[in-house]
């Protein structure tokens, strides 16, 4: 059992308290006084223990494309640069490239990612080998996977390990024909399960869908029954008031990817409007080919900054709400209700924020500091499922240089 003492704790109510926290096995055992003696003591030294970040949308294995094809609009980037390289990917590549992404997540205080990509067997193996938590979903489209494979994955990976789970999904309306979309809708009905996909990312995507079906992607997919049990829409940039009414009615998560949307010039999601309407918000980075970082601090700051610019209002969004979205919101979006907060009985997915870094001083408002001036530099420790995987700039239990070598080797073959 590990005892965390002598520091701040961000409680389940998102309040700063000063209490001891005991972690036994993979879970938070006790907050406050405990009669049992700890096996080891972690002296927080005045730092902050808080729930980890959860990356609610990414394509981890796309590390191969980082700074390989930049400064292009989305469709050109996908069609001319990404899809041809993805066609060359082998299953082992997914393992090696994902491992690289997992290391980067840990440096950003991320304990779990929501990943849409190919070869889920390799993704699950990499995640389990490292001890990282991964929620997977299907990238089903007109060119890969099938309704049967999605159902097989859904059944297999929801009983694979404590660290792995699987959600129904498909790539996007514009890459997936109506019959396949209907097939996913039937699976959602069969399992009473939410569905996740890219939606409303670019203006062109929305306009093309209106030409095809006479309505926006949100309204079309809702008509197809995709959101009968909720789900999530990655990006959610070009959304109308009618779309947002569907989000609210169906409990659809708006999964915001500010860095990727800015870099690809896709637009700015109306997060402030969504929050005012009571729409669920989660935060992800998107993939390392389009962002190009897997950094939740950058995402939080970009959301705050772009909302203020877009609304011409310095008080447009509350940074504390954005911090909640990156932790609790993203966890709930991913179905990770058992590791969302620092509370007894919850899984021990925890991070330590170094309050002794210059960017975190002076201490006026710790939580606002995390959003406005925080960076990876302030992550002192990342714990996943009760195991410390990253601490003081070092990865525990893995050979980082070997992971870098294998990822570079896979990338060189795809060029």
Map each language-model feature to its residues.
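His/Asp/Glu-enriched, well-ordered alpha-helical/loop segment
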Residues: 223-230, 272-357, 373-376
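Divalent metal-coordination and catalytic microenvironments
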Residues: 7, 21, 26, 46, ...
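Alpha-helical scaffold segments that flank or form the walls of functional sites
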Residues: 66-131, 151-160, 407-413
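Active-site gating loops and adjacent loop-to-helix segments of metal-dependent hydrolytic enzymes
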Residues: 64-96, 130-138, 203-230, 250-253, ...
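Active-site microenvironment of metallo-dependent hydrolases
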Residues: 1-19, 24-25, 34, 324-415
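Metal-coordinating catalytic core of metallo-dependent amide/deamination hydrolases
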Residues: 123-240
């Amino acid at each position: 059992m590990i005892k965390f003492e002598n520091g701040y704790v961000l409680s389940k109510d998102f309040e700063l308290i000063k209490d001891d926290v005991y972690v036994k096995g993979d879970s938070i055992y006790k907050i406050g006084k405990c009669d049992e003696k700890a096996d080891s003591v972690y002296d927080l030294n005045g730092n902050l223990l808080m729930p980890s970040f959860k990356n609610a949308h990414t394509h981890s294995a796309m590390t191969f494309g980082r700074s390989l094809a930049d400064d292009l609009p989305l469709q050109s980037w996908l069609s001319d640069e990404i899809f041809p390289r993805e066609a060359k990917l082998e299953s082992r590549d997914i393992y090696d490239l994902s491992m690289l992404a997992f290391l980067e997540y840990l440096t950003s205080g991320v304990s779990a990612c929501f990943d849409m990509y190919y070869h889920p067997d390799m993704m699950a193996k990499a995640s389990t080998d490292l001890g990282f938590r991964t929620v997977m979903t299907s990238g089903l489209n007109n060119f890969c996977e099938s309704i049967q494979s999605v159902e097989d994955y859904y059944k297999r990976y929801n009983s694979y390990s404590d660290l792995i789970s699987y959600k129904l999904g498909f790539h996007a309306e514009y890459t997936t024909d109506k019959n396949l979309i209907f097939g996913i809708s039937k699976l959602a009905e069969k399992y009473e399960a939410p569905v996740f996909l890219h939606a409303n990312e670019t203006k062109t995507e929305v306009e093309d869908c209106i030409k095809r079906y006479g309505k926006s992607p949100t309204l079309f997919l809702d008509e197809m029954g995709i959101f009968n049990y909720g789900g999530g829409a990655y990006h959610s940039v070009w959304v109308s008031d009618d779309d947002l009414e569907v989000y609210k009615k169906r409990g659809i998560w708006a999964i915001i990817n500010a860095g990727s949307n800015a870099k690809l010039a896709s637009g700015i999601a109306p997060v402030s409007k969504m929050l005012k309407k009571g729409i669920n918000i989660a935060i992800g980075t998107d993939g390392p080919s389009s962002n190009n970082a897997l950094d939740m601090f950058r995402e939080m700051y970009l959301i705050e900054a772009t909302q203020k610019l877009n609304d011409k209002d310095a008080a447009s969004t509350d940074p504390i709400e954005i911090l909640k979205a990156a932790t609790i919101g993203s966890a709930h979006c991913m179905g990770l209700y058992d590791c969302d907060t620092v509370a007894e009985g919850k899984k021990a997915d925890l991070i330590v924020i170094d309050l002794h870094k210059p960017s975190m001083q002076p201490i006026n408002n710790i939580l606002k500091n995390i959003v406005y001036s925080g960076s990876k530099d302030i992550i002192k420790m990342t714990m996943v499922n009760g195991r410390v995987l990253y601490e003081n700039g070092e990865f525990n239990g893995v050979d980082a240089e070997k992971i870098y070598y294998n990822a570079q080797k896979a990338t060189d073959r795809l060029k």
